[in-house]
Amino acid sequence: MLIAGPTASGKSALALKLAQASGGTVINTDSMQVYRDLRIITARPTPDEEALAPHRLYGTVDAAVNFSAGAYVEAAAVALAEVRVAGRLPILIGGTGLYFKALTRGLSAVPPVPAEVRDAVRLRLDRDGVQALHAELAGHDPEAAARLAPADRTRIARALEVVLATGRPLADWHQQTSPPLLPPDDVVAVFLAPDREALYARIDSRFAAMLQGGALNEVAALAERQLDPLLPAMKAHGVPALIRHLRGEITLEEAASIGAADTRHYAKRQFTWFRHQLPEFKWVRPQEADAFLNTVMPGRA
């Protein structure tokens, strides 16, 4: 069972309800909720919620790790095997489309980039700026350079790392994929699609609740580690803005506004991404989800 959807759409509550009713195990498919340092700011299930049904792959990775889609698929393969041996229903839930695509379509065969290449590219990114790297990428991989926004630091650096390390453009590697761990015909895949305005209001209220629940202290502890700002955990929604506040650059109110706005923009992109990249997911209104699950999984939802 795959449950996807934009952030704050009610995925976790639905997955927990299904796990309790079916004897299932909830398996995380969110790229930020894997980090143990970020329970509050990523809206990970609470300890009380985790006690109601088995949960896997939540808070298992240190924030200093650049946890890739390949690493996720490897971890998910182990979790799925263990859940199946236990005779439980695997319920994969999250909002990271790339993870779902890797699970159901297979993973591209991009080899690991040597640390010295990655470090050299990041050093030049900080020293020379993203425009210089974008121009260099155009010389090595013009297709990627044309496709990527000139200010997209992360993706430009990644594309340049791959072509420098392997001598082949990233698109070439993406054409080679491994067999999918979860073929589309073997799963029920749902995308929760709430009303946009209601979702955005919920995002705003949830971000405020996160701050009241200790998100600022959580981010302060992360900031004290002085990790590479390009690491995924350091770019989780709300983290950069709250770090700016902790440095005295902006007020807490400004940080909250930026964090909530970034999250709303991300939710909008999730709608678009799933519609175009994973059209096999069944779009369901949250209020209709129970009825849909009872139809496709009678007696288990």
Swiss-Prot record:
<feature type="site" description="Interaction with substrate tRNA">
    <location>
        <position position="96"/>
    </location>
</feature>
<dbReference type="GO" id="GO:0052381">
    <property type="term" value="F:tRNA dimethylallyltransferase activity"/>
</dbReference>
<dbReference type="InterPro" id="IPR039657">
    <property type="entry name" value="Dimethylallyltransferase"/>
</dbReference>
<dbReference type="Pfam" id="PF01715">
    <property type="entry name" value="IPPT"/>
</dbReference>
<feature type="region of interest" description="Interaction with substrate tRNA">
    <location>
        <begin position="30"/>
        <end position="33"/>
    </location>
</feature>
<feature type="site" description="Interaction with substrate tRNA">
    <location>
        <position position="118"/>
    </location>
</feature>
<keyword id="KW-0067">ATP-binding</keyword>
<dbReference type="InterPro" id="IPR018022">
    <property type="entry name" value="IPT"/>
</dbReference>
<feature type="binding site">
    <location>
        <begin position="7"/>
        <end position="12"/>
    </location>
    <ligand>
        <name>substrate</name>
    </ligand>
</feature>
<dbReference type="InterPro" id="IPR027417">
    <property type="entry name" value="P-loop_NTPase"/>
</dbReference>
<comment type="similarity">
    <text>Belongs to the IPP transferase family.</text>
</comment>
<comment type="subunit">
    <text>Monomer.</text>
</comment>
<protein>
    <recommendedName>
        <fullName>tRNA dimethylallyltransferase</fullName>
        <ecNumber>2.5.1.75</ecNumber>
    </recommendedName>
</protein>
<dbReference type="GO" id="GO:0005524">
    <property type="term" value="F:ATP binding"/>
</dbReference>
<comment type="function">
    <text>Catalyzes the transfer of a dimethylallyl group onto the adenine at position 37 in tRNAs that read codons beginning with uridine, leading to the formation of N6-(dimethylallyl)adenosine (i(6)A).</text>
</comment>
<keyword id="KW-0460">Magnesium</keyword>
<keyword id="KW-0808">Transferase</keyword>
<keyword id="KW-0547">Nucleotide-binding</keyword>
<keyword id="KW-0819">tRNA processing</keyword>
<feature type="binding site">
    <location>
        <begin position="5"/>
        <end position="12"/>
    </location>
    <ligand>
        <name>ATP</name>
    </ligand>
</feature>
<dbReference type="GO" id="GO:0006400">
    <property type="term" value="P:tRNA modification"/>
</dbReference>
